[in-house]
Each structure stands twice: as C-alpha cells, then as structure tokens.
C-alpha cells in the first residue's frame, strides 16, 4: 500500500495493482493451506470439537466476565482511531488541504504505517516501564487525544507539521495490542480463544462504525471548488478525539493489570 500503490497506480492504473495484490493474497492462502497443520505435535489429535451447546455456554461465560465491558469500550475506539485516519482521511486531507499529489501522499502514509508497526513493538517495551497495562493504555489514549486536538485546533498547519502529526498519531495510537493482552488476562485457558475473539470484535466494530460517523460528518460540509474544506477535516479530528475520550472514561473502570 501507500507509496508502492501510488507508484503502480500512476504507471498502470488502479486495477492492475489490485489484481496483483489479489494474486499475492491467493498464493499466501495456498501456502498457508499447505504448510499449516491442524494438530501440532504438542496437541491431542484425538480431541473432539465441543458441541454447540458448550460453545454457546462458553460465549455466555465470556460476556459475563467481570471487567470485560470497559476493555471492550476502549478497544472499540483505540485501533479505529488510528485506522480511520490512516486508511480513510489522511490522503484526502493531504490532498485537499496541502495539495499533495498521489505519490507524495503515499510517502507520508508509508511512514505512518511504519510508525504504527514500530509503535506496536514499542508499547510492549513501554508497559513494564509504566508498571501496568491499564496505565499504558491510558497513556496511549491521552496521547491520541492530544494529537487529534492539535490537528483540530490548529488552522492551516504547515505541511511538515501536519505530516508529522499524522505520523505521530499512528505511532501513539498503536496501543490496541496492550488492550488485547489485558483482555486475555480476564479468561481461563479454555475460554481464551472465545475471549480474545470477543475483545477483538470491538476492534472490528469500531473500524466500521467510526469511518461511517466521520464520513457523515465530512459529508455535512459543502465542497469548495470540488474539494472538502479544511474545517471538515478539523471537525473530523475533533470527533475522533472526543470518541477516544469517551472510551477512556469507560476504560477507567477496568481492572488494573
């Protein structure tokens, strides 16, 4: 994605890169099918799947787990706040407000994506320093709110500042992995798979709800000369920041682990 996609789209049109990605994805899927075993050597190959009644009962136990609700609420917005900016609004913002072409936008987004990956690794190191998963998540959430507030309140920032803030946002907002780890700690081993899946359901839900919300907000602003005005993007950054604040308020009731 990002720079490679922008370069290939300029050279071949947008369809060819997507066909290429589809082929690579298919090859990876075939490799996974051929190379991954259902039963590693350390597992019981004779184990039978649970009956549906036990599966549903286990899911009910997961939903009733103390401490799940605040973790679910925070995970609803944590990853979505990053992905909505990186995957949806960063490129239009850089084009409409700062006049960047597709390759230049791709370069910024490439660095944003790299920052997100680095952030995931960095949060694993940061958690022991801060002393708890809860403190780490709150730190990341407050940092996200701060970056969104700057982008929302700063009219016409210079390009270097806008791009830097977008990269910083992806770096700071990559604390979702800590929420997943905290959620895993709520469940016994036999419920671990269903428990983590339930926690990640919040991430998936947020990643389609927040883009819809921000898209409706952007659409409420009339275009000027065929472009979305800066005020629409600033309102969107404010909306994302407010959503993170609401998630943090709910998350304060989570267990300290």
Annotated model-derived regions:
Residues 39-72:
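Juxtamembrane intracellular "pre-TM" segments in multi-pass secondary transporters
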Residues 186-223:
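A late C-terminal transmembrane helix in Major Facilitator Superfamily
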Residues 128-142:
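Cytoplasmic membrane-interface "Motif A"-like loop-to-helix N-cap segments
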Residues 66-123, 207-215:
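Extracytoplasmic gate region of multi-pass secondary transporters
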Residues 142-156:
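C-terminal ends and interior cores of transmembrane alpha-helices
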Residues 1-40:
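Helix-loop-helix hairpin linking two adjacent transmembrane segments in secondary transporters
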Residues 119-132, 218:
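Helix-to-loop junctions at the C-terminal end of transmembrane segments
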Residues 30-35, 237-257:
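Multi-pass alpha-helical transporter architecture, strongest
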